[in-house]
Structure formats: C-alpha cells, structure tokens
C-alpha cells in the first residue's frame, strides 16, 4: 500500500514540476529507513531528463515540503529520472507502453502467484491485462502493487 502522505506530497510536487516543464512520474516514501527516504521520479516533457532538471525540482520542492510541514521529522529527499524499469502509473504510460514486456507484482497471490511477466495489453478500471505467451490474463487492479517495464522479456 502507498504511504498515506503521498497524496499530499504529490499535490505539493505537481505544480512545481509543471512550472519547470516536468511531470511527476512516481513517488515512494520509505519509512523503513533511518532517516526515511522520499524518492520522487520526474520526467522532462520536452527532452531527455537531466541532472539539472532533478536539481532544480529538488531545490524548489524541498522548501515547500518544509513550509507545509507535510513530513514530520528528518527525511532524505531523492529526486531522479525514471529508468527503463520504472513503474507505470498513468493512463498515458499504459497506452504508450501497450505491447511492451512488463512485470506485475501483487500485494497478495493471484492464481497462486505474486509476480507476473508478460506483454501489456491494456489497463482498464478493473484490471491489468497481459498476454502470457499467447494466453490472456486479467489481474485485478486492487491486487496490483506495481507494474514495471521489464527488460528481461
């Protein structure tokens, strides 16, 4: 399950990203680390995402998170660009990567498995649809922990 602070963090981060021509792709708050780590992946909408994009976003976001007191106590802010193994989260990404190999991880076993590798067919309101060597499968969305591009088809 996503951390309960993530919606507030996203609400704070998205306007800053938009102002810089960036898009927030993924937000993860790892509270099992000391100090906790807030990792935000951003993508430049007009060109390859560079270190400068991440630095500018981080410098503008950090004071806003502090001012709004969203995260209590000390934490580490990591801003990076999504790699090829990034999580697919938006409708746009699921459309753009239709036909690509993906890895789906579930919170609980579905048909006795917690990890599925196949070709992305689509995502709808109810499920993530994959093609597994010619066989179609629909994994209920409420069970899906993450969907990543898979570089090992």
UniProtKB/Swiss-Prot annotation:
Q: What is this protein called?
A: Ribosome maturation factor RimP
First-listed, main subcellular location of the protein, grouped into a coarse class: cytoplasm
Q: Which organism is it from?
A: Picosynechococcus sp. (strain ATCC 27264 / PCC 7002 / PR-6)
Q: Which family does it belong to?
A: Belongs to the RimP family.
The UniProt function text for this chain reads: Required for maturation of 30S ribosomal subunits.
Concerning InterPro entries, the annotation shows:
Ribosome_maturation_RimP, RimP_C, RimP_C_sf, RimP_N, RimP_N_sf
Q: Which domain of life is it from?
A: Bacteria
Is the keyword Amino-acid biosynthesis in the record?
A: no
The cellular component terms of Gene Ontology attached to this UniProt record, alphabetical and capped at eight, are:
cytosol
Q: Which GO terms describe its biological process?
A: ribosomal small subunit assembly; translation
Q: Which UniProt keywords apply?
A: Cytoplasm, Ribosome biogenesis
* Compartments, as annotated in UniProt: Cytoplasm
């Amino acid at each position: 399950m996503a951390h309960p602070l993530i919606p507030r963090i996203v609400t704070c981060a998205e306007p800053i990203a938009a102002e810089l021509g960036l898009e927030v792709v993924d937000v993860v708050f790892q509270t099992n680390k000391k100090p906790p780590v807030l990792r935000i992946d951003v993508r430049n909408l007009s060109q390859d995402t560079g270190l400068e994009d991440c630095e500018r976003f981080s410098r503008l976001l950090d004071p806003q998170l502090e001012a709004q007191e969203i995260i209590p106590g000390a934490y580490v802010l990591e801003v990076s660009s999504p790699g090829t193994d990034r999580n697919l989260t938006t409708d746009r990404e699921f459309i753009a990567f239709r036909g690509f190999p993906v890895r789906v991880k579930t919170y609980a076993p579905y048909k006795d498995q917690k990890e599925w590798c196949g070709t992305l067919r689509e995502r709808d309101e109810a499920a993530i649809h994959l093609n597994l060597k010619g066989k179609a499968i629909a994994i209920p969305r409420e069970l899906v922990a993450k969907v990543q591009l898979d570089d090992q088809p």
